[in-house]
UniProtKB/Swiss-Prot annotation:
Transmembrane segments: none annotated. One of its GO terms (molecular function) is adenylate kinase activity. AMP binds at R36, A57, L58, I59, G85, Y86, P87, R88, Q92, R158, R169. It is found in: Cytoplasm. Gene3D superfamilies: P-loop containing nucleotide triphosphate hydrolases (3.40.50.300). Zn(2+) binds at C127, C130, C147, C150. It comes from Rickettsia typhi (strain ATCC VR-144 / Wilmington). Its EC number is 2.7.4.3. The lineage of its organism: Bacteria, Pseudomonadati, Pseudomonadota, Alphaproteobacteria, Rickettsiales. This is Adenylate kinase. GO terms for cellular component: cytoplasm.
Amino acid sequence: MIVIFLGPPGAGKGTQGKKIAKKIDLPHIAVGDIFRTIIKTSTSEAELINNYVKQGALIPNEIVNQVIKIFLLSSQYKNGYILDGYPRNLEQARFFESFIKKAQIKIIYFDVADELLIKRVLGRYSCKNCGKIYNVHFLQPKTDYVCDVCSSNVFDYRRDDNEEVIKKRIEVYKTETYPLIDYYKNSGNFYIVNASKDEQEIENDIQKILKIN
């Protein structure tokens, strides 16, 4: 099974991707995490990508496509995966379908209001050890400064997240991705979830779509 999670930054794709992947025993591939890892390297490619991220602009298709193709054609993903953050536009979708059959794909779109997106993104942080995602407004650890999952007390706050950049990312996302939504609507494998709901309700809705018990 190949599942694509579509939605703007802050829609909850990463949180749900990890949870659903664990339930159906498939890897969760977060494109944003892949590129943040690349940015930490001391390469000219990392510097180039980092410049796009700081401006809130999308990384060019040719860079994204080649990086993702290398990942997806790895043998560890031969049985399927949950793909979070790709494709982002029609060009990427068509490139994706050049090596993945469209009939194998289920697409789930996370629909959520802009105001809530901004609040979610500005408030989110994660455990540096296990990657568990938290939010200062909606989801804090049960014990202050201690991760619920691994008990680490080291957290990672996204330095590229500020309100101006987030607003630009949302607008860029709409311009680039809305035509992709129309493209997938006619596929017969396109579903919409109300991502303004709480975390458990969203998970339940996705499980129904994927027919997970």
